[in-house]
Swiss-Prot record:
It comes from Mycobacterium tuberculosis (strain ATCC 25618 / H37Rv). Residues 1-64, 204-248 are annotated as: Disordered. Residues 62-198 form the Nudix hydrolase domain. Its cofactor is Mg(2+); Mn(2+). Residues 9-20, 45-57, 220-230 have a biased composition (Basic residues). Disulfide bonds: none annotated. There are 4 mutT paralogs in M.tuberculosis; the exact function of each is unknown. Mg(2+) binds at residues 103, 118, 121-122. GO terms for molecular function: hydrolase activity; metal ion binding. This is Putative mutator protein MutT4. Pfam families: NUDIX. It is an enzyme of class 3 (hydrolase). CDD domains: NUDIX_Ap6A_hydrolase (cd03673). A motif (Nudix box) lies at residues 103-124.
Length: 248
């Protein structure tokens, strides 16, 4: 056999060995235990190509706005005699959760007007707005929607009326000593608002109404909004920003 024929024979044998090695590698790759080895990019790609496509449905996000108030009786008198109106709702775990009265801003209302109306509807008493306490933002999911809720809260002066729990959404209403608010309010965000109210009442009593910060501008609502409710039964940690919040 000539030198040229020997070289061709070696090249053919090399190609056959290469094909056998490649086939052996593929067989080892396909025989990997599914639970013991991390898929290689090749196997992961094949798995993805065989899996059915999932629907591209996205959860709709809605934005809702509410308003409420912390109504103080005796706001000009001794601090130890001051009381605040709270509402109680029973969740599906049977817990009575105390919070501030509040509700959705209706068409044509400002946030302050809503706070006055909702306080009257949920507690039976009348109040006037003195100052803004702040706002609370939180998210929750209900009826296949992600709801971003913003609630505006106000410090309010008690004007008159009798406590009443005729609102079907409210289990109890009560006058609570203002010093007990940190232990009574179920939600951390509302407890922080009570601290702000305490500071504002000190300013009101020491320097008069002129010492209170001016109310932020509030325009009447021009479009109706959805009315969703957070489910307290799922609220294992009241006051969280990302999760069920304090009611309507």
């Amino acid at each position: 056999m000539s030198d040229g024929e020997q070289a061709k024979s070696r090249r053919r044998r090399g190609r056959r060995r290469g094909r056998r090695a490649a086939a052996t590698a593929e067989n080892h790759m396909d025989a990997q235990p599914a639970g013991d080895a991390t898929p290689t990019p090749a196997t992961a790609k094949r798995s993805r190509s065989r899996s059915p496509r999932r629907g591209s449905t996205r959860m709709r996000t809605v934005h809702e706005t509410s308003a409420g108030g912390l109504v103080i009786d005796g706001i000009d008198g001794p601090r130890d005699a001051q009381v605040a109106a709270l509402i109680g709702r029973v969740d599906r775990r049977g817990r009575l959760l105390w919070s501030l009265p509040k509700g959705h801003i209706e068409l044509g209302e400002t946030a302050e007007q809503t706070a006055i109306r909702e306080v009257a509807e949920e507690t039976g008493i009348r109040g006037s707005v003195l100052a803004a306490l702040g706002r609370i933002d939180y998210w929750f999911v209900t009826d296949g929607r992600r709801v971003h809720k913003t609630v505006h809260h106000y410090l309010m002066r008690f004007l008159g009326g009798e406590l009443s729990d005729e609102d079907l959404e409210v289990a109890e209403v009560a006058w609570v000593p203002i010093r007990e608010l940190p232990s009574r309010l179920a939600y951390a965000d509302e407890r922080r608002l009570a601290e702000v109210a305490d500071e504002l009442i000190d300013k009101l009593q020491s320097d008069g109404p002129a010492a209170l910060p001016p109310l932020p501008p509030s325009s009447p609502r021009r479009r109706p909004q959805t009315h969703s409710r957070a489910r307290h039964a799922d609220d294992s940690a009241p006051g969280q920003h990302n999760g069920p919040g304090p009611g309507p």
